[in-house]
A protein has these predicted regions:
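Active-site rim/loop-helix segments in enzyme catalytic domains that contact anionic ligands
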Residues: 1-63, 183, 192-195
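Metal-dependent de-N-acetylase/amidase catalytic core
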Residues: 47-195
């Protein structure tokens, strides 16, 4: 499992790019990621543009992920819905044999959309009760985001409690303590014995 950050968050209200970078490194350690990358696209400007899509497609060919987890297209944050549309183009480009991106073509098998700042029509729920301590520690590693109180409608001093409440709600649907919701755009094939 790895994370590719598209920007350095340089235009964010809280924290400097250096602070945010250090926080990302700390959170990655807490999550025990196998890799972490930084694409360096401009913060506040993520959109489905050919240069951005080529950069992301080249990264997909290098990293070769089977599954991508990206922000939902309905998120209120412009960079989040921009990431969704950019990712869809990059996935297509990465698979094209004649796309001049370097490396061998790569086809991502599955895209899951995560719940950010808006509601989603979740059709995949993952029991995360066993990793909630790590989940909270990874969020708290982003200390600059919690300095100074209220930042926006969604980034408040109560963000962890609010997100835990949301995870508790989704967990009740599975009869577990916490569940992370995702939306799969395509049907998932399940083992009927696993139901």
């Amino acid at each position: 499992v790895g994370i590719l950050e598209l920007t350095r968050g340089e235009k964010g209200t809280q924290g400097t790019p250096a602070e945010r970078q250090a926080e990302c490194v700390a959170a990655a350690r807490l999550m025990d990621l196998s890799w972490r990358g930084q694409l360096g696209l401009p913060d506040g400007e993520l959109a489905d543009t050919p240069p951005f899509a080529h950069a992301l497609a080249a990264a997909l060919r290098t990293v070769r992920p089977r599954v991508l987890v990206v922000p939902h297209w309905h998120d209120r944050h412009p960079d989040h819905f921009g990431t969704y549309h950019l990712t869809k183009r990059a996935i297509h480009l990465a698979a094209l044999k004649k796309a001049d991106l370097g490396g061998d073509p790569w086809r991502v098998q599955r895209v899951l959309l995560y719940q950010g700042n808006s509601d989603i029509s979740a059709n995949v729920l993952v029991d995360i009760g066993s990793v909630m301590t790590e989940w909270e520690a990874a969020i708290r590693a982003h200390t600059s985001q919690f300095a100074g109180g209220y930042v926006s409608e969604t980034v408040t001093p109560e963000i962890i409690e609010r997100r835990q409440g949301r995870l508790t709600y989704w967990g009740t649907l599975l009869r577990v303590k916490y569940a992370e919701p995702f939306e799969a755009e395509e049907p998932l094939l399940l083992d009927p014995l696993g139901l």
